[in-house]
Amino acid sequence: MLEDLRANSWSLRPCCMVLAYRVAHFCSVWRKKNVLNNLWAAPLLVLYRIITECFFGYEIQAAATIGRRFTIHHGYAVVINKNVVAGDDFTIRHGVTIGNRGADNMACPHIGNGVELGANVIILGDITLGNNVTVGAGSVVLDSVPDNALVVGEKARVKVIK
């Protein structure tokens, strides 16, 4: 956790966000190991959701797996699904959404080490972002990305004209 705080330059909001996520992730992992752990873990997880979603406006689900030195810049409107796996040195900015493509497909992205996401990036589906990938602001990523790549642009295209 100390590495996370250093990676966030000791800035109050990002440090609080990462620290809260780390505690919630610990609770999420340990409550599955023994049913008695729910006595202390479940109330903390409920409190985590209330504080993060209602008061701070972001949703990094406790079951998401994020590696060391997780950095957040301007962490407003961030949504990370519980099935997301991200490596070390993962950096995000405001408006980032990482998750599945819908109720019929619950698979989520696997994100490598050293990945940096710009503002308002959307990453959806069963894809892999390689190591040392940078995704530019406003990009929509629906396909896997190889290592050491720079990804920019939107994926939207017209299907039907009304």
From Swiss-Prot:
The keyword Transferase applies. The keyword Metal-binding does not apply. It is an enzyme of class 2 (transferase). Keywords: Acyltransferase, Lipopolysaccharide biosynthesis, Repeat, Transferase. One of its GO terms (cellular component) is cytoplasm. It comes from the Bacteria. Pathway: Slime biogenesis; slime polysaccharide biosynthesis. Its EC number is 2.3.1.-. GO terms for biological process: colanic acid biosynthetic process; cysteine biosynthetic process from serine; lipopolysaccharide biosynthetic process; slime layer polysaccharide biosynthetic process. CDD domains: LbH_SAT (cd03354). Pfam families: Hexapep (PF00132). GO terms for molecular function: acetyltransferase activity; O-acetyltransferase activity; serine O-acetyltransferase activity. Belongs to the transferase hexapeptide repeat family. NCBIfam families: PRK10191.1, WcaB. This is Putative colanic acid biosynthesis acetyltransferase WcaB. It comes from Escherichia coli (strain K12).
